[in-house]
Amino acid sequence: VPMPPRRASPDAWRRPAAQVSRLDSDAASHRMRARKPMIMPRVVCPSPVSSVDGNQSIGTLTHAGCRNTVVFSSASGGAGTSVFAAMVAWRLAQRKLQCALVDCDFAAGGIDVLLGIENEPGLRFQTVDIPLGKTEGAALNGELPQWERVGVLASQPWNGSDPEPWTVSAVLEALAQANDVVVVDIGAPSALHSLPMLRQCRQVVLAELTVLGLARARAARAMMIRQGESRPIMVGVVPRGL
């Protein structure tokens, strides 16, 4: 007996579209699960007031007048300390914090060349003149060349002698009072021997993620703790050259 023809329901045309939509949704959901999450770099802003026994957040200081100074160094040459310090200063400036970047690597210097502002007018460490051992931070800020809304005080050892320790101390204290954050690049941790005013500042040490780089970083960390300096924050880096 022949079966009577099935009468299509009025909304039968919707079913293929619904199935396609469900398949697209399932495929999109699968792609989202398979996709690795994007991890954005996090920059910790310093707290205006921190205790000596505070946590490991960037900006904790014991040096009076420089509570918002952060010192960057690396036990391995070419690890990108200057670039890392400049990027931290740049990110802080993006967060609407007034930031100064200071080049205290008096053996090599040249952070203004790295940033492409070597021809910009303004102060360099070799041209700072503080005869009375004290200066106004706001006036000093106004004399610094700017890079991405960051005032930069570079060192140019090829254009003069190293500044006197009291000049460095006066500059750092003035900048700390006139800025939210002062980022200091000293090159190597051993530079703290000639920069005693920075020994109790928050230290960030870059460790190159190689066998030799980690051994150097471990020795530098032990030396800093042994000499009574603040326990450093260690940051692992993998330099990528040409």
Segments predicted by a language model, with ranges:
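Conserved protein kinase catalytic core
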Residues: 109-111, 160, 191-193
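Cytosolic-facing regulatory segments adjacent to core modules
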Residues: 134-189
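Charged, alpha-helix-enriched surfaces in structured cytosolic catalytic cores
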Residues: 80, 106, 135, 163-170, ...
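Hydrophobic/aromatic beta-strand patches that form the interior of the parallel beta-sheet core
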Residues: 70, 100-102, 151-153, 202-205, ...
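Walker A/P-loop phosphate-binding motif and the immediately C-terminal alpha-helix
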Residues: 66-115, 175
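Phosphate-binding loop that captures ATP/GTP phosphates
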Residues: 92-152
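Conserved catalytic-core segment of NTP-binding enzymes
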Residues: 170-242
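Acidic-aromatic/histidine active-site loop/patch
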Residues: 1-70, 118-138, 201, 215, ...
